[in-house]
From Swiss-Prot:
The lineage of its organism: Archaea, Methanobacteriati, Methanobacteriota, Methanomada group, Methanococci. This is D-3-phosphoglycerate dehydrogenase. Pfam families: 2-Hacid_dh (PF00389), 2-Hacid_dh_C (PF02826), ACT (PF01842), PGDH_inter (PF19304). Belongs to the D-isomer specific 2-hydroxyacid dehydrogenase family. It comes from Methanocaldococcus jannaschii (strain ATCC 43067 / DSM 2661 / JAL-1 / JCM 10045 / NBRC 100440). NAD(+) binds at R149, I150, D169, C229, A230, R231, D255, H278, Q279, G280, A281. One of its GO terms (molecular function) is phosphoglycerate dehydrogenase activity.
């Protein structure tokens, strides 16, 4: 009999599903020692965010086949350790989409009609009908930043209120946005100028941190209302505070903050700020969905079926996985680089295999590449199983081919194009490490780590030096560097490994240097 251990509170409907495939023991509030003891006999472990499934817990698991996370994030699970032991990790990335979208609309309405302030006034015994005059959503323009799962749910609900929708998402094709009834804009500043309401639904990355900053807030209408139910850090809270205090925009409604819980946050002293304590997924329905979705995923895995929400990888023979795994990691890295270099809606990608790879079944490599390609632009839920489906839904045309040319041995070449530019890169595994061998036709031999900068330039004396000086002026250390060129004085490419991420203002400074043609900074 399959033994299923549940160590965090789980909806009763999820328990019933699990009971169809095994003997369920619910043991919440376990100490670390108790968990280490109970995990020995478990075939399945189901957790939420409370249980920490660390490497030592996984190493104690003698029979464990599946770990189920009833929710999205897997920060509390050592996925690498699970993968090493062949344990499949599944989650429920779609469980909270509707709940977050509904909270977004709720906060939007509350801010527009001053509902929290009016409620507080009424409870103080006041009856002030003039002070809390609000505005309608009908006929207003809503700017949606990020048109993924949650953003799309917000669009549906906003349209029901009669709102006009404009969207900013450089990774969504125009025709996909149009099919949702969204006018796609190319520039976030244009969205900020035109929108009466602005809502954010993007992941927090070095690129999206303070995506709404002082410049964007200065462009907003005096009556603008901004809503954030995504991630703290997307908005420059200092700039937002100043604008709200000075009456430059109407209001803000926040479910997330840069520091949680917020300590002495001046935003919470303002009457035109309303908020909730990160309640996006805190609904009965979302909790039920998280439990039942992950329970169904566990059922599929136990029955030998392919589950859609596998976090680490499909259940494949270990011998095959051992051979392909280095190239899967290489492909994922190349995909990550390609998306961040193109920085736009990817239209077409070709994967070209050479050497022994040309004779292999490459489906897993393609899936790994797509996972890497999509990871920089999705909040959560991208994995080897669903990456091809998501790519197809985004109209990304993927072609695979092989070549008898063995210039680099077992190598993967990627050629890709967006609506803005084209890019190609070749990578291989050398001494068990992923190595970049070619960038846009320029030969190099470079091991990318941490933060990678790819800078195209004209090969002129002093150009590289000025780039290095600019980085140094901003306290950004260069760990390693290489230049690829075809001939002296012609177009060249420099690759740099950096110890720190590069702020947008530094990238702009580098672009201003004479002979610099293009700058791309990739966070690996």
């Amino acid at each position: 009999m399959v033994k299923i251990l549940v160590t965090d509170p789980l909806h009763e409907d999820a328990i019933k599903i699990l009971e169809e495939v095994g003997e369920v023991e619910v043991a919440t509030g376990l100490t670390k020692e108790e968990l280490l003891e109970k995990i020995k006999d478990a075939d399945v472990l189901v957790v939420r965010s409370g249980t920490k499934v660390t490497r030592d817990v996984i190493e104690k698991a003698e029979k464990l086949k599946v770990i189920g996370r009833a929710g999205v994030g897997v920060d509390n699970i050592d996925v690498e350790a699970a993968t090493e032991k062949g344990i499949i990790v599944v989650n429920a990335p779609d469980a909270s989409s509707i709940s977050v979208a509904e909270l977004t609309m709720g906060l939007m309405l509350a801010a527009a009609r001053n509902i929290p302030q009016a409620t507080a006034s009424l409870k103080r015994g006041e009856w002030d009908r003039k002070r809390f005059k609000g505005i309608e959503l009908y006929g207003k323009t809503l700017g949606v930043i990020g048109l993924g799962r949650i953003g799309q749910q917000v669009v549906k609900r906003a349209k029901a209120f009669g709102m006009n929708i404009i969207g900013y998402d450089p990774y969504i094709p125009k025709e996909v946005a149009e099919s949702m009834g969204v006018e796609l804009v190319d520039d976030i500043n244009e969205l900020c100028k035109r929108a009466d309401f602005i809502t954010l639904h993007v992941p927090l990355t070095p690129k999206t941190r303070h995506i709404i900053g002082r410049e964007q807030i200065a462009l907003m209408k005096k009556n603008a209302i901004i809503v954030n139910c995504a991630r703290g850090g997307l908005i420059d809270e200092k700039a937002l505070y100043e604008a709200l205090k000075e009456g430059k925009i109407r209001a803000a409604a926040l479910d997330v903050f840069e520091e949680e819980p917020p300590k002495d946050n001046p935003l919470l002293t303002l009457d035109n700020v309303i908020g909730t304590p990160h309640q996006g997924a805190s609904t009965e329905e979302a909790q039920k969905a998280a439990g039942t979705i992950v329970a169904e995923q566990i059922k599929k895995v136990l029955r030998g079926e392919l589950a859609e929400n596998v976090v680490n990888m499909p259940n494949i023979p270990q011998e095959k996985l051992g051979k392909l795994k280095p190239y899967m990691l290489l492909a994922e890295m190349l995909g990550n680089i390609v998306m961040q270099v193109l920085d736009g809606s990817v239209n077409r990608v070709e994967l070209i295999y050479s050497g022994e790879l040309a004779k292999e079944k490459t489906d897993l490599i393609k899936r790994a590449f797509l996972k890497g390609l999509l990871s920089p632009i999705l909040l959560a839920g991208i994995n080897l199983v669903n990456a091809p489906i998501i790519a197809k839904n985004r109209n990304i045309n993927v072609v695979e081919s092989s070549t008898s040319e063995e210039k680099y041995g077992n190598a993967i070449k990627i050629t890709a194009e967006s609506d803005k530019k084209k890019f190609s890169i070749v990578g291989a595994i050398i001494n068990n490490k992923p190595v970049i061998l070619e960038v846009d036709g320029y030969e190099v031999s470079f091991i990318p780590e941490g933060v990678l900068a790819i800078i195209k330039h004209i090969d002129r004396p002093g150009t590289i030096g000025r780039v290095c000086i600019t980085l140094g002026d901003y306290g950004i250390n260069i760990a390693s560097m290489q230049v690829g060129r075809k001939e002296p004085g012609g177009e060249s490419v420099m690759l740099l490994n950096l110890d720190h991420t590069v702020p947008e203002e530094v990238i702009e400074k580098i672009k201003e240097i004479p002979n610099i043609k293009d700058v791309a900074v990739i966070n690996l």
